Curated annotation (Swiss-Prot):
Protein name listed in UniProt: Large ribosomal subunit protein uL22
GO molecular function, one term: structural constituent of ribosome
GO biological process: translation
GO cellular component: cytosolic large ribosomal subunit
InterPro entries the record matches: Ribosomal_uL22, Ribosomal_uL22_bac/chlpt-type, Ribosomal_uL22_bac/org-type, Ribosomal_uL22_CS, Ribosomal_uL22_sf
Entry similarity comment: Belongs to the universal ribosomal protein uL22 family.
């Protein structure tokens, strides 16, 4: 089972937040908390709060055991950008974009769940490509 927590419009660029997200994916929650506490990045603070929220969601709402939980997925997508102007030389100006992120952390208690999801995705891709190849073969037959 998967439990998750979301946080929208966090004032940090998604590129910087993804660096910290990559550190904790696949780790047990205790290890992930230690990594985030010792990471000197602004995103680590936001992800720590979000991880604690996801842990409480998993234990209270879904009845999962805290000992088995691990970080199934951590995503930092782009949120809305604020555009500001900054004065430049000779009376001109340029635009500053202050980016924000939408953060999502998913926790799971089943270690095989990630493998199952990957195999399902691979099967879907195979079906789609096989269907595409069959359509191309039909088009070639019609042309001949």
């Amino acid at each position: 089972m998967i439990a998750f927590a979301k946080q929208y419009r966090v004032h940090i660029s998604p590129q910087k937040a993804r660096l910290v997200c990559q550190l904790i994916v696949g780790k047990k929650i205790n290890d992930a908390q230690n990594i985030l506490l010792n990471t000197p990045k602004k995103a680590a603070y936001f992800l720590t709060k979000l991880l604690n929220s996801a842990i409480s969601n998993a234990t209270n709402n879904h009845g999962m055991s805290g000992d088995l939980l691990y970080v199934f997925e951590c995503v930092a997508n782009q949120g809305p950008s604020m555009k500001r102007t900054i004065a430049r030389a000779k009376g001109s100006g340029s635009v500053l974009t202050k980016r924000s992120s939408n953060l999502v952390i998913k926790l799971s208690d089943n270690p095989n769940e990630r493998k199952l999801l990957l195999t399902q995705q691979k099967e879907l891709v195979k079906k789609r490509t096989m269907g595409h190849k069959k359509e191309k073969a039909k088009q070639k037959q019609k042309q001949q």
